[in-house]
Amino acid sequence: MSLLEKINEPAAIKKFTLAELDILAREIRQELVQTVARTGGHLAPNLGVVELTLALHSVFDLPRDKIIWDVGHQCYVHKILTGRRQEMTSLRQFGGLSGFPKRAESPYDAFDTGHSSTSISAALGMALARDLKGEDYQVVAVIGDGALTGGMAFEAMNHAGHLQANLIVVLNDNEMSIAPPVGGLAAYLSRLRTDPMYSRGKEELENLLNRLPHLGPRVLKVIDRLKDSFKYLVVPGMFFEEIGFTYLGPIEGHNIARLKEVLQHARNTRGPVLVHVITTKGKGYQPAEDHPDRFHGIGPFDPATGEPLAGGGPPTYTSVFGAELVRQGEKNNRLVAITAAMPDGTGLTPFARRFPKRFFDVGIAEQHALTLAAGLAAAGMHPVVAIYSTFLQRAIDQVIHDIALMELPVVLAIDRAGLVGEDGETHQGLFDVSLLRCVPGLVLMAPKDEQELRHMLVTALQYQGPAALRYPRGAGMGVPLTGTAQPLPIGKGEVLRRGRDVTILALGPLAYAALEAAGDLAARGIEATVINPRFIKPLDEDLILTWADRTGHLVTVEEHVLAGGFGSAVLELLARNGRKGIRVRCLGVKDEFVHQGKPAILREHLGLTPAGIRAAVQALLAETPVLHRRRNQTKGISGG
């Protein structure tokens, strides 16, 4: 029996020897590789925190003590140790385990995460609640060096240092973003500062010197001055000390004995403590160590080689956007591109290579990214901010206050709009339309395919104000990418198919699902008009009202929440224009969060498939007698 099979609860590992914990770490790595090879997921981050997670579970008493995993994608080892090992085959699958911590899933998950830089704020809140209620437990936030670039993390640390709250922050430094220690002396000083004997010895020395008349206090002052100067020279954690944290580290993050020793010391230290741990992303699996970025988040792969199993197919929307942006950059030397720590994910890497001086990666700082773009635009440049829909949520005030109020020409390229799939509710791009549709002067578009995406990028770049285009994750529709991208007339949709019984307004690539549904309906004697709206704001009001009058029935379809979404915009249009007799059904996401699963499965679950659209049309028409429908259709179907 393997050691891993002996673990029914995390307390079991407290009895393991250090040698057994090292063996357990190897077993966990092997299981991680095999599991993620089947399900896909965040492999490299989890391989890097195996020993750290074992040490945390050895020192702290979960679930009484609380561990909050920043971002949360590095929680797989934690899930294995907390009774979910048998369910790991369902990781990130529909109805299975989430790829992130989830309070509803386990009492061992103290706080839901998915976005970056939130853990320290949450940990501080829990620590304050503990103290106000007179309870006694430890609160630990585990945050990566990348997440520490987020301003929210520093806001929380500043507040924690001011309050001198009892909490522990573990800095998982896996890319050496923070300066490494300087030589053996720094390591020696770090060793002293993590040893409980250091604090006691320092106090005893001070007491001894204070008993010496005249000489003692003077020596202490000299020692303090030397100590302060010395610390800034050789210890890389003095920033944290200055804001009120006790800094412990840097620590070898794959040495379980050392990790346990330091974490125990942190547990016994009053006030906020930062434990700086150096880890290797992808540790123990050579392909992931060689290519940690590629294995940060990966689909199913061959564990023997590390090569992805899936391949081929149409280019992704992201890659088409990136290629077109480079073409536009060749024509316009005022065009600049901005990302918030996602150059590969947003398709900006080719632009960065071609125009390094016109590319800016701001780190995990979405608010700064948007206002940086505003400043660039105000000074005569034309910025494009490529950002995931879910992360744009963090910078809506900047869109309104810093961009739209001044009508600045900033382009928002909103990637991962709609259902993103296996990353689940924290990453679905289902709120951007509601958030942006209300912003005065902003143009909002959604392409039906990758060719139209090219045209919309050019349209956005030619618009003299804020413009946004939202497009999904994954492969395009496979349409030919031909010719030079041309601007589209703003606020004009297109009719893809004409019919007399019902009008289907399908946003983005769902236009193709609507066309398929229309074909199925035609076989059943129902004639449907299918419209690609193209523009969510401004709507093509004439086109929509014309076809609403002709057919008397509208179905809107969108990969977005219904509240405040595209369907809401259509309903508002009808109400403003007194179209009380038009019957409407809106398809989209109701008042719920959408959990993880493959996008195709999620669309089926939500009724956003050809079959779902067909059923919605049939249900809508069933509410109105055929004779009454025909009498109300007083206009022909030509034109429009």
UniProtKB/Swiss-Prot annotation:
Q: What GO biological process, any one, is recorded here?
A: thiamine biosynthetic process
Q: List GO molecular-function terms, semicolon-separated.
A: 1-deoxy-D-xylulose-5-phosphate synthase activity; magnesium ion binding; thiamine pyrophosphate binding
Name the GO cellular-component terms. Answer: cytosol
Top-level taxon? Bacteria
Question: Cofactor note from UniProt?
Answer: Binds 1 Mg(2+) ion per subunit.
Q: Which PROSITE patterns match?
A: TRANSKETOLASE_1, TRANSKETOLASE_2
Q: Which UniProt keywords apply?
A: Isoprene biosynthesis, Magnesium, Metal-binding, Thiamine biosynthesis, Thiamine pyrophosphate, Transferase
Q: Which InterPro entries match?
A: Dxylulose-5-P_synthase, THDP-binding, Transketo_C/PFOR_II, Transketolase-like_Pyr-bd, Transketolase_BS, Transketolase_C, Transketolase_CS
Which CDD domains does the UniProt record give? TPP_DXS, TPP_PYR_DXS_TK_like
Which positions are annotated as binding Mg(2+)? D145, N174
Q: Please state the Enzyme Commission number of this protein.
A: 2.2.1.7
Enzyme class, top EC level, equals transferase
Residues noted as binding thiamine diphosphate in the record, renumbered to the chain: H73, G114, H115, S116, G146, A147, N174, Y285, E366
Cofactor(s) needed for function: Mg(2+); thiamine diphosphate
As its record notes, the protein acts as a catalyst of: D-glyceraldehyde 3-phosphate + pyruvate + H(+) = 1-deoxy-D-xylulose 5-phosphate + CO2
- Quote the pathway field: Metabolic intermediate biosynthesis; 1-deoxy-D-xylulose 5-phosphate biosynthesis; 1-deoxy-D-xylulose 5-phosphate from D-glyceraldehyde 3-phosphate and pyruvate: step 1/1
Q: What does this protein do?
A: Catalyzes the acyloin condensation reaction between C atoms 2 and 3 of pyruvate and glyceraldehyde 3-phosphate to yield 1-deoxy-D-xylulose-5-phosphate (DXP).
HAMAP family listed in its UniProt record: DXP_synth
The record's note on quaternary structure and interaction partners says:
Homodimer.
* Recorded family membership: Belongs to the transketolase family. DXPS subfamily.
* Identification of the protein by name: 1-deoxy-D-xylulose-5-phosphate synthase
What is the species of this protein? Answer: Moorella thermoacetica (strain ATCC 39073 / JCM 9320)
Q: What does UniProt list as this organism's lineage?
A: Bacteria, Bacillati, Bacillota, Clostridia, Moorellales
